């Protein structure tokens, strides 16, 4: 029992030390993590207007989508799904001059619907580009693809 307790204590101590050695998140990085959390919450609650408030009016992506196209995609997805659950994993946050940033993340998506199986599930990888305008982060462009596929 003493060996188990000592081993457990050592593991906990090493984890605490390792966390203490990592750099603290910068203010812009913390803001972007909070931005992602707000977006996930809005999507799970199917709050399209709240989500669109996070997208810049000048949004454009490599697929040729503009802001209105993204709103249409959200509208269709929200209408098709009865419930939505998202499991995000932020892989990387890059900050440029504290007014621009890039987030690379993987999101597991599951939803219940009225289809034959009654549910759908996918995993996507996203590369999001953001700008900070008037103290608010706004999505200006995005690339995405199913997990394992090329981002476009």
Per-region residue spans from a language model:
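Bacterial N-terminal signal peptides that target proteins for export
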Residues: 1-9
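Bacterial N-terminal signal peptides
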Residues: 8-18
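Short, low-complexity N-terminal intrinsically disordered segments enriched in polar/charged residues
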Residues: 19-48, 53-54
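Short beta-strand edge/turn micro-motifs at domain boundaries
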Residues: 22-25, 100-102, 120-152
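Hydrophobic alpha-helical core bundles mediating ligand binding, dimerization, or RNAP-core interactions
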Residues: 36, 55, 74, 107, ...
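A short gly/proline-enriched turn/hairpin at secondary-structure junctions
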Residues: 54-67
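Surface-exposed, charged secondary-structure patches
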Residues: 76-119
């Amino acid at each position: 029992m003493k060996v188990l307790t000592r081993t457990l204590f050592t593991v906990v101590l090493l984890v605490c030390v390792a966390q203490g050695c990592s750099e603290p998140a910068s203010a812009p990085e913390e803001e972007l993590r909070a931005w992602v959390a707000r977006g996930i919450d809005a999507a799970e609650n199917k709050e399209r207007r709240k989500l669109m408030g996070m997208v810049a009016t000048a949004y454009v992506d490599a697929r040729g989508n503009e802001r209105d196209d993204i709103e249409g995609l959200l509208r269709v997805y929200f209408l098709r799904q009865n419930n939505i659950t998202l499991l995000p994993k932020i892989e990387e946050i890059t900050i440029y001059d504290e007014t621009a940033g890039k987030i690379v993340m993987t999101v597991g998506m599951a939803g219940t619907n009225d289809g034959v199986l009654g549910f759908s599930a996918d995993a996507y990888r996203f590369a999001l580009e953001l700008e900070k305008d008037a103290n608010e982060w706004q999505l200006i462009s995005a690339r995405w693809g199913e997990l394992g596929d090329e981002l476009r």
